[in-house]
């Protein structure tokens, strides 16, 4: 397994750790039910390099904003001070990007969506 695949596995585990399913943005299974999180990682080009990417929290609008904000808070708390996670050949540091969270202006009807911005640094051993 290469470094990029290892980083993708680490990110998948991270994004599935908040009580809702996490899917790669282009791999949402047919029939997936809300709520869920989608993400599209950008893997840094080399060791000690940084990249940014986003994830999206998707919730039914009928639930109001509280559940989406609670999940956002859980993810934010997990990243407090940066989260260092070992992976093949080193580790990644995952941090909140700037701006951290912002609602989607015109989500599809019946949906609420919040963008979350991340910074990722790939560190060598």
Question: Predicted segment positions?
Answer:
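Charged, amphipathic alpha-helical segments and their flanking helix caps
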Residues: 1-31, 38-125
């Amino acid at each position: 397994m290469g470094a990029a695949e290892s980083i993708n596995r680490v990110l998948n585990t991270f994004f599935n750790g908040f009580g809702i399913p996490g899917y790669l943005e282009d791999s949402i299974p047919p029939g997936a039910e809300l709520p869920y999180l989608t993400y599209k990682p950008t893997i840094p080009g080399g060791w000690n390099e940084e990249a940014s990417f986003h994830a999206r929290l998707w919730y039914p609008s009928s639930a109001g904003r509280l559940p989406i904000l609670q999940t956002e808070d859980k993810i934010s708390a997990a990243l407090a001070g940066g989260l260092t996670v070992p992976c093949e050949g080193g580790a990644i540091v995952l941090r909140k990007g700037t701006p951290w969270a912002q609602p989607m202006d015109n989500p599809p009807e019946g949906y609420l969506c919040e963008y979350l911005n991340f910074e990722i640094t790939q560190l060598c051993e």
